[in-house]
Amino acid sequence: MASGILVNVKEEVTCPICLELLTQPLSLDCGHSFCQACLTANHKKSMLDKGESSCPVCRISYQPENIRPNRHVANIVEKLREVKLSPEGQKVDHCARHGEKLLLFCQEDGKVICWLCERSQEHRGHHTFLTEEVAREYQVKLQAALEMLRQKQQEAEELEADIREEKASWKTQIQYDKTNVLADFEQLRDILDWEESNELQNLEKEEEDILKSLTNSETEMVQQTQSLRELISDLEHRLQGSVMELLQGVDGVIKRTENVTLKKPETFPKNQRRVFRAPDLKGMLEVFRELTDVRRYWVDVTVAPNNISCAVISEDKRQVSSPKPQIIYGARGTRYQTFVNFNYCTGILGSQSITSGKHYWEVDVSKKTAWILGVCAGFQPDAMCNIEKNENYQPKYGYWVIGLEEGVKCSAFQDSSFHTPSVPFIVPLSVIICPDRVGVFLDYEACTVSFFNITNHGFLIYKFSHCSFSQPVFPYLNPRKCGVPMTLCSPSS
């Protein structure tokens, strides 16, 4: 009720020209009131057009001197500006300024207005339409914009998820690299510690040998000096004594003097000493990385028992050893032991058949004085020969192996020469530390077989290249005559 009264009052104090609340209101004799600025502008226009002034509402002429300020209306307008309409009066479908229904849409200003707003100076000359006419058009536009934004939101969420995934991946990768770096440098420190200890032991041994030799030389020189001193004293005594003393046994003295030979002591020139060379750290790191890389392909290898091999296999199929010696009784009951004939049957294959890919395994050969291990293309009965002479261990017969004899001689077996086809070409391997554990890496596609000395920090022992794998290949073990077992290591060992 109060809101309706306020709306009616507002209509009474609205300028008919600008349709706004009266500002500095002026009243004419006819009773109509206008803003001072609006009435002044209208007066000037009327005088130019007609030569007289008339009320813009009722067209009754007036004299400028009869215009008077309307203080009463000005006070009402001032009070009205201070009063806000109640929520009921401020309906969303009514103009907040004029109280009229919002039925029009101004295209230039993008606003919903009432018919009084349309006639005001603010919207004069603008393109206006009924709200019902433009609502559907803008609804379609807003729906399209909404769908586009939802699609952008989905893309943003997917990109956000990708970034989180990439962030987690990078974190995992860098953590993995950190772990590898720590492991590599820990190994490097172990090698440096070992090299330092080994070098110090060599120096201590060198010091012991040299000082012992020099001590012996010193003792000999002391003895020689004492003998010379005694001989000199004898000669001086003879020369200072009587004729009888001079001639008594003179020939023996002269002979002793002539036979004096000064034995020079053994010396050790410092310029001929072995010069210490610091280890190649870059090369060591490359070795670590190569071994770390191939160990990613570690497979769990076990042996496959068969009826033709005389090798002894453990229950878990990881240990292979030579058979125990047999007791033989000779003539007159003489008792002695001998091994069975180590022919082709002594070798044993791994159970894994390899036809592609990269494969790595390790064999523990600690405390063994003889062994052969590597890769074999399978047993070939038509190529059986005396393994005791190593005749069959050649790549052309399907063997890519290395071996140890007499506890120190490490060799690789290559193809024989044209002149001696039955004898493999033995390649002596320079191994500083005899391996207690050997790593074998087979790259089927690259046609290579590599052997690593795990005991000596993973240094490469030997590598077969250009291997011809025409059929499936298997891990190969031969314990030879040494009774100590050779063991296939598990990846977790």
Curated annotation (Swiss-Prot):
Domain B30.2/SPRY: 281-493
Binding locations of Zn(2+): 95, 98, 117, 123
Reaction catalyzed: S-ubiquitinyl-[E2 ubiquitin-conjugating enzyme]-L-cysteine + [acceptor protein]-L-lysine = [E2 ubiquitin-conjugating enzyme]-L-cysteine + N(6)-ubiquitinyl-[acceptor protein]-L-lysine
SMART domains tied to this protein: BBOX, RING, SPRY
PROSITE patterns: B302_SPRY, ZF_BBOX, ZF_RING_1, ZF_RING_2
Coiled coil spans: 130-241
Protein name according to UniProt: Tripartite motif-containing protein 5
